């Protein structure tokens, strides 16, 4: 039995067949307020359902593929994981659930790279669907795990199978992570979590350089506190200020992965190079944020 197969078996045994949280979370989400952005209507429930999909969606690999330059998609249908390839080893962004790590490893290998060449592991925010698998990735590859300082306490509370969550480097807003000539900048875009991290980098394709933004979730809690309200106001302002040619996110639906991948397979211009869509997700989430605030104010909440 190969090492990846053994690890897959072990993960299933440790985690068991329990249902993914998406169904319970979606059922607990309100179907109001409703906002309409670019002709489409959204509610808190529909946004979460769009992001998480079904339990099967969360674990089924999406076809691994090149996005642009040295950036590749290696995640599932509804949970993004990105591979940044460099001559000195690779950077993985978002391990997702621990049970998905062997799947991500296989996607990396299908692209012709070695999962063992993962030197750095980054994440967008301290929720299990994005960073629960960090300890297993480190166990398999020895990668250095780096995270925004504000999210470290929540990350360390994640202990799948009793594993301690590794943190090799705590990052601050604006710090750079560099490997093999590629630099990613950690941008604090708090609100969804205290250390929600949007990553920016540059990619080359066809003799041109493009600005790539990998968004952390911009989704507001249904009853944001004054502190979270202040954080999200700063975050939306910041996100709108970032140079962007290619917008990615921690859930594929946030940047229309399926539609863009279908166009990519047809040939022609790279559909991921789409500056006009860079703020679409911010528009949706900011509209919902203000609608939630209006409801909260109407109900007499602080």
Q: Which stretches of residues belong to each language-model region?
A:
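Zn-dependent metallo-beta-lactamase
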Residues: 22-89, 298-302
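Divalent metal-coordination and catalytic microenvironments
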Residues: 70, 84, 94, 125, ...
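Metallo-beta-lactamase
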Residues: 90, 96-99, 166-167, 176-178, ...
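Bacterial N-terminal signal peptides
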Residues: 8-18
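N-terminal secretory signal peptides that target proteins for export/translocation
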Residues: 1-4
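Active-site HxH/HxHxD metal-binding segment of metal-dependent hydrolases
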Residues: 27-30, 71, 99-102, 108-176, ...
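Conserved beta-strand hairpin/beta-sheet module of binuclear metal-dependent hydrolase folds
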Residues: 57-111, 115, 198-219
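C-terminal regulatory/interaction regions
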Residues: 25-30, 275-302
């Amino acid at each position: 039995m190969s090492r990846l197969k053994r690890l897959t078996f072990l993960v299933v045994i440790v985690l068991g067949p329990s249902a993914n949280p998406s169904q319970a979370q979606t059922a607990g989400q309100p179907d109001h307020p409703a906002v309409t952005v670019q002709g489409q209507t959204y509610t808190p429930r529909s946004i979460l359902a769009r992001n998480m999909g079904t339990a099967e969606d969360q674990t089924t690999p999406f076809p691994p593929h090149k996005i642009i330059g040295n950036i590749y998609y290696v995640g599932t249908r509804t949970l993004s994981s990105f591979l940044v390839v460099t001559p000195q080893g690779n950077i993985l962004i978002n391990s997702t659930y621990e049970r998905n790590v062997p799947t991500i490893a296989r996607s990396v290998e299908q692209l012709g790279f070695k999962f063992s060449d993962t030197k750095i592991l980054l994440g967008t925010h301290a929720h299990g669907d994005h960073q629960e698998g960090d300890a297993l990735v480190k166990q398999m590859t020895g990668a250095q795990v780096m995270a925004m300082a504000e999210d470290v306490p929540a990350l360390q509370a994640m202990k799948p199978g009793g594993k301690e969550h590794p943190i090799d480097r705590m990052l601050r807003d604006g710090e750079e992570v560099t490997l093999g000539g590629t630099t990613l900048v950690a941008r604090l875009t708090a609100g969804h979590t205290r250390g929600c991290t949007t990553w920016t980098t540059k990619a080359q394709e066809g003799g041109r350089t493009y600005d790539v933004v990998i968004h952390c979730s911009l989704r507001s809690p249904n009853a944001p506190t004054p502190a979270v309200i202040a954080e999200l106001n700063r975050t939306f302002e910041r996100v709108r200020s970032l140079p962007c040619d290619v917008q990615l996110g921690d859930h594929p639906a946030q940047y229309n992965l399926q539609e863009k991948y279908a166009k990519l397979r047809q040939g022609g211009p790279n559909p991921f190079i789409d500056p006009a869509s860079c703020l679409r997700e911010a528009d949706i989430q900011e509209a919902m944020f203000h609608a939630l605030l209006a409801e909260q104010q109407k109900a007499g909440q602080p």
